[in-house]
Regions:
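Alpha-helical membrane-protein architecture signal
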Residues: 23-24, 118, 122, 126-130, ...
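Hydrophobic alpha-helical hairpins/lids featuring a short glycine-rich hinge
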Residues: 1-18
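Transmembrane helical segments that form the transport core of multi-pass membrane transport proteins
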Residues: 134-231
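Hydrophobic core segments of alpha-helical transmembrane domains in multi-pass membrane transport
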Residues: 62-71, 86-101, 146-159, 183-186, ...
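Alpha-helical membrane segments and immediately flanking helix-loop junctions
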Residues: 13-74, 200-276
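Long, contiguous bundles of hydrophobic transmembrane helices that form the permeation core
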Residues: 87-139
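Loop-to-transmembrane-helix entry motif
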Residues: 15, 48-51, 132, 136-147, ...
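Alpha-helical transmembrane segments
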Residues: 81-96, 240-248
Length: 276
């Protein structure tokens, strides 16, 4: 673990000025998901500073796993947009993390800050497989439970909105629709023409409330010009902006995944993770 941190994290530390552990986690997020990337710095999570822990969380939310890029591309999203967004997410996530939670402590990544013995190796292949399966199952159960709870909560909120909207002739009222209206100014600020801002804001809202996969799925017909906006196909400029904006795990469900994943790796930091 130590030599990997010195090799990869050290390079990013010099370029970005961040600690080696958070830099390595950000780099790993380019290739793997938000629950797998923190595993490369797992021995250090429990002793990370609040700023480092927040940077790890931001990196996971800002990026997507490399394994899902093909799925998004099959919906019609240009692969060059997805790859560019993934690589931009690593330094971008660290940048915003440090703006929101600046480092006020002294990060440490030596053996005294690690949770357990870094040199503790499995006795053989069977021991390694058993330990990996046990850790993986614990992580999956925690993530699954948190994800189920958050999705259920969102469904309950949408049910309430739909019922209230039905009283006023708007049974289609939902959290996603409200966020679409709410995020239309944001869509306009990032370059989407106002005539397309409400539609773009709706996709951003879907990404935030549900997940980016559902948002891309609903965005696909616009990419193929199967759905028109006021009788006109969505502009290529807007398609590119939305493709970048949706490429990330930042949504309410991912908060549950982070809480379950990082919480199982460092139970003593669960409160800090939830507050972040």
């Amino acid at each position: 673990m130590q030599w990997v941190i010195k090799l990869l994290g050290g390079g990013l530390q010099k370029v970005l000025g961040t600690s080696r552990t958070e830099s390595l986690s950000a780099t790993a997020n380019i290739f793997v998901g938000q629950t797998e990337a923190p595993l490369v710095v797992r021995p250090f999570i429990s002793k990370m500073t609040d700023s480092e822990l927040f940077a790890v969380m931001c990196g996971g939310l800002a990026s997507v796993a490399g394994s899902v890029l093909a799925g998004y591309a099959s919906m019609g999203v240009k692969m060059e947009y997805l790859i560019a967004a993934s690589f931009m997410a690593a330094p971008g996530g660290l940048l915003f993390a440090k703006l929101l939670v600046p480092e006020t402590e002294t990060p440490s990544y030596d053996e005294n800050s690690a949770d357990g013995d870094l040199d503790d190796k499995p006795a053989n292949v069977i021991d390694a497989a058993a330990a990996g399966a046990s850790a993986g199952l614990q992580l999956a159960l925690n993530v699954g439970a948190m994800l189920l709870a958050f999705i259920g909560l969102i469904a309950m909120i949408n049910g309430i909105f739909s019922g209230v909207g039905g009283w006023f002739g708007m049974p289609e009222l939902s959290l996603e629709l409200l966020l679409g209206w709410l995020f239309s100014p944001l869509a306009f600020l990032i370059g989407v023409p106002w005539s397309e801002a409400v539609v773009a804001g709706s996709f951003i809202g879907q990404k935030l409330v549900v997940n980016e996969f559902v948002a891309y799925l609903n965005f696909a017909p616009y990419l193929k010009d199967e759905v028109l906006i006021n009788g006109v196909a969505m502009s290529d400029h807007t398609k590119a902006i939305i493709s970048f904006a949706l490429c990330g795990f930042a949504n309410l469900s991912s908060v549950a995944i982070l809480l379950g994943g990082l919480g199982s790796m460092a139970p003593n930091r669960r409160g800090t993770i939830a507050m972040a």
